[in-house]
Amino acid sequence: MVNPTFTDGEDSFAGWNTEANDGASFSTGGVAEIMKIARGKNGSFDINQTLTDLTNGIYMMSINGLFLSGGDIYSEFNAGQFYMNNTYNYAMTSSEDIIAEADAQDQVNCLLSDDEEYKDGEELIGYVPSTFKGCSYAYNAGRYQNFCATEVTDGTLTIGMRSLGTGIEGDWLPFGNLHVYYLGNAEEANEKLAEVLDGFVARAQTIVNLIASDGYEGVTQRPNISNE
């Protein structure tokens, strides 16, 4: 894989194909000595790279990232995806890996000077990143880890990060710590794939626990959430 850390080239995206629509843009930032963060912003976009001459079998991607729609940390309107060939997983939203106030360690697993407070009414639940620097610390601590897996049958694997676009100004998909692993054939990969599935189950439970309140006015930001 070429430039998995997004540190090469004049714009840091050397080796990657980038497609931007509807005003989308790409950039990098963060705390370099902690973790470089790349991101796509606004509109719809696709950042991808195709690997060839690979051994056939099961491959897994691990990447830290989140999707923030319209600059709203409470939004569950998700258009961000991490993908491998025709398999994709939606990026976590801010609320899926809140660091609790009691567990927050400044400049270790969060950046209190930059992070936003996540509240339930007046009650502080914890903190979520909303800047490049905040993502560097959160991701380096293992927060917002996403997985995707697929089977390669022709020696070719395309990996990528994309947003389908929400039509809302301020969409943001920051990511880093990208790794791609070869897990072997289907039988050999079972144990590692179980970890991926466990991650999906944990995410599903988190989403179930985050039903929007009846008083929330931004219903367009949560089009798929119902408390029925």
Q: What is each model feature region?
A:
Residues 35-38, 47-52, 133-137, 145-149:
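Beta-strand-rich interaction surfaces with strong enrichment in secreted/lumenal proteins
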Residues 65-135:
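Extracellular ligand-binding interfaces
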Residues 187-228:
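Amphipathic, heptad-repeat alpha-helical segments
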Residues 6, 45-76, 147-151, 157-159, ...:
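Extra-cytoplasmic beta-strand recognition segments
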Residues 168-190:
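Exposed low-complexity, polar/acidic, P/S/T/G-rich flexible segments that act as propeptides
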Residues 16, 39-42, 55, 66-83, ...:
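Extended, low-complexity, turn-rich repeat/linker tracts enriched in Gly/Pro/Ser/Thr and Asp/Glu
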Residues 2-41:
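Extracellular glycan-recognition surfaces and repeat-rich motifs
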